[in-house]
Design a protein with these regions (language model features):
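Metal-dependent phosphoester-hydrolase catalytic domains
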Residues: 32, 36-37, 86-88, 149, ...
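Surface-exposed cleft-lining segments at the edges of enzyme active sites
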Residues: 85-90, 116-138, 165
Length: 242
């Protein structure tokens, strides 16, 4: 649909401050895409001030090892947010979800920024009372119920899924199946190896049937010799489904 696409950028910032070479390079890379929407994980609040626009963030993560400005999930838009939800489902591990509705060139869009727990969450750190993949599966179960009740608007879900799609070594088949079930009604446009990248990622963009992909491309985490992150970035242009 001519004139109705928007760019959604996703980048892992690896807790770097914006005035460090790594953080500054990451911010510059996102700015170069001139997105309408951006979703970031493992990032710091307030570091997209140079963009203008509006930011929403998940609740602070639990644990003393996190700085006061660290967040697991952030979403940014050129336009104001409304109907913001930083809880989702109270049973989900805290601080890994934020959602809001914003206006884009395709109209109103519901954006859900997420950071699904990695397989060792609360195993090596935190409460240390969980088994591998337990928190990941628990989060997916609760998030799946939340997704089923979401709005009829165009929906974008983006963030760190902590799984490669399709499944490769690492995730047990039941874990991959759980993720697939939650997103059965969505198109995960970043599946496989995005153009511009040399490997599949664990950061993804998923869209519901109100939207269609126009293009998807990625960029490696090394930008001109500067390591901007421990993950690659990805951007998708989408339009309203015909």
């Amino acid at each position: 649909m001519s004139g109705s696409s928007y760019a959604n950028c996703l980048l892992e910032l690896e807790r770097k401050k914006s005035h460090t070479p790594t953080g500054a390079a990451a911010i510059a890379r996102i700015a170069a895409e001139d997105p309408e929407l951006a979703v970031l994980t493992e990032a710091r609040i307030g570091h997209r001030e140079s963009f203008g626009g509006y930011e929403i963030a998940s609740q602070p993560p639990a644990g003393e090892r996190f700085a006061a400005d660290e967040r697991k999930a952030l979403a940014w838009s050129q336009n104001p947010w409304r109907n913001v939800d930083a809880v989702g489902d109270e049973r989900m591990p805290i601080g890994r979800f934020v959602a809001g509705t914003t206006t884009t060139s395709v109209g109103d869009v519901r954006v859900m920024a997420i950071c699904i727990p990695w397989h060792m969450c609360d195993v090596r750190y935190g409460s240390k009372d969980r088994k591998p993949w337990e928190q990941h599966l628990r989060w997916l179960e609760c998030f799946g119920e939340l997704m089923a009740a979401e709005s009829s608007l165009p929906v974008v879900v983006a963030g760190d899924f902590n799984q490669r799609i399709p499944r490769r070594k690492g995730a047990p088949s039941d874990v991959a199946d759980a993720l697939a079930s939650v997103f059965a009604a969505f198109d995960i446009v970043t599946s496989g190896v995005p153009a511009g990248c040399a490997r599949p990622g664990i950061d993804h963009i998923a869209i519901n049937d109100r939207l269609q992909r126009a293009s998807v491309r990625g960029w490696p985490n090394d930008q001109g010799g500067t390591r901007t992150s421990d993950h690659d970035g990805v951007v998708a242009d989408v339009h309203l489904a015909r």
